[in-house]
Amino acid sequence: MAEENNEKKKPSSPRKRTPKKNMSLLPDEGQMIQYSLFDTKQKINESTSTLMDLRVSPFMPVDKISHNSALAREFVANKNILKRETAFGTVEIRNRLLTQYHKMILDCIMVHNVRSVVYKGTIAIYFSIYEIAQQLGLEWNGKTQKNIQEAIEYIKDVVIVRTDADNPSITSSYNIIQEMKYSSKEQAYVIVLSSQYAEYFNKTISINYNKRFDELIAIRGKGSAFIRSIIEFFITHDASADNIQRMKLMQLLETINYPCETPRQITSAKQYLKEYENELAKFSIKYYSGSQLFEYSGTTDIRFIPPLDGFID
């Protein structure tokens, strides 16, 4: 596997290709792999995210975390572990804290990748950092490239431990990314998903919101990470005009791990809800300030992908 530290200053966009024998940067793909991995690859190709990565998200509802914030201090005091318990399940984030910035980058890789291949018991995904910068509306320069690379390395460092609310005895532990490298041959970066994450993807519900993704990441400005987190949470629910999902403000803030220890933080949350009312409405989310109640009546172009049968050995 060829390695380089950087892409060219402004690399050309890699073209999507039809996989051919022995063409891959990653050799011997599929030759000694169980067939279930090809099903998993197809499932990942058809998904934007796992449902639980949105509903009980390891990504904090902010774009940046200050080192002296209460959340960061709690994380360090607890030996770099953050545990979140919700009505939908429990998640532990270990080693590093992740934000909506990291989530957008990961989603860009999932949605706008060049291609994916089966590789050594897991899945590898080719992508362009330049394309990610374009999708996020960032000016392309060395600093932007470095920041995105570092963000992906952050994701690689994190260990996620999940417990299902319905089955507390079932626990999943995984890194999302096993490694990241650059191929001069392909003119693209490649991330290799950990085999544990591929297994988790295989056995859990995933969600496809690709058709709404560009609209979601176009929500920008102060408070936008908070609003995106709300949208990501609600779209995991199978709602409709005849099956409206409702939730009180404080329950939602606790579920998405929004800091609400002080009256000022709650006031800020309410102000963001007012400022981004139209963006929420595009995803059929309505907030009633008087009763402090959310209503969600379902979003078009959202698709749920069921778990595959069996597990990856």
What are these regions (language model features)?
Residues 2-313:
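Charged, alpha-helix-forming regions
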